[in-house]
A protein has these predicted regions:
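Glycine-rich phosphate/pyrophosphate-handling loop used in enzymes and phosphotransfer proteins
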Residues: 1-197, 201-230
């Protein structure tokens, strides 16, 4: 009864207060969509999940035995994708994170990839307190729920607070040395996991996390991000 009432209330609410596209303000069928169809189809897809080997592997440390590396979208400065990321991370619009998670789950499902779980890149506690949430958790929890697999948001711990500066891959790698460790209270069963982050830039953060995860016996790893920035 209660789910039916909730659905009825949502339908009435949508009738009087229709959802609007975050970008162009056109009406959209559901608030979960975030964008109208026109704006969504103009998001720049990478199609990197279809490429073997992935061209994005070159951004990760070459010694890492990664299965797949892919990103949903290409970052474009001043464009819609940058605006979405900013509103999500810094304005706290978690609906955008849910949207990203739904699109990531759809890509994984349609490309017939199979994972035993999803792992999120952690924030340092200081940065998480300042922001109020870890944006990767929103994406990861949504994706995992839709794929009916577990989300491991606490398997990694960030123990070194690093400055948010634009550096070379080598410099970032040195700064991030020993920045992550495994949480001794969380057990990761053997299997193939997807490590996710919101954006791939130099690859140093994802490489540092991957190195720690791959120290676990009988674990294989792929990497997926929402955006790739050249």
């Amino acid at each position: 009864m209660f789910p039916a009432l909730a659905q009825l209330f949502e339908s009435v609410f949508d009738l009087f207060f229709p959802a609007r596209c975050l970008h162009c303000n056109r009406g959209i069928a559901s608030p979960k969509a975030v964008l109208c169809l026109y704006c969504e189809i103009n998001l720049p897809l990478t199609y990197s999940h279809l490429m073997h080997p992935s061209p994005l592997k070159k951004y990760l440390f070459p010694a890492l035995p990664l299965e797949r590396v892919f990103a949903l979208y290409v970052f474009e400065e001043g464009a819609l994708i940058e605006s979405l990321l900013y509103q999500f991370k810094y304005d706290g619009n978690k609906a955008i994170g849910v949207f990203f998670g739904r699109r990531l789950a759809g890509l994984i499902h349609h490309s017939k990839q199979a994972y035993d779980g999803i792992i999120g890149v952690p924030l340092h506690p200081k940065r998480k307190r300042k922001r109020g949430f870890n944006q990767v958790d929103v994406i990861g929890q949504t994706t995992a729920m839709l794929l009916s697999i577990p989300y491991f948001g606490e398997i990694l711990q960030r123990v070194k607070h690093t400055p948010k500066l634009s550096q070379s891959k080598r410099d970032r790698g040195e700064i991030l040395h020993n920045a992550f460790r495994l949480n001794p209270r969380v057990i990761l069963p053997k299997g193939h996991y997807l490590l996710i982050d919101d954006i791939l830039t130099t690859g140093a953060t994802l490489s540092a996390c991957s190195k720690v995860i791959l120290e676990i016996a009988k674990v294989s790893l792929s990497i997926g991000t929402i955006v790739y920035r050249n």
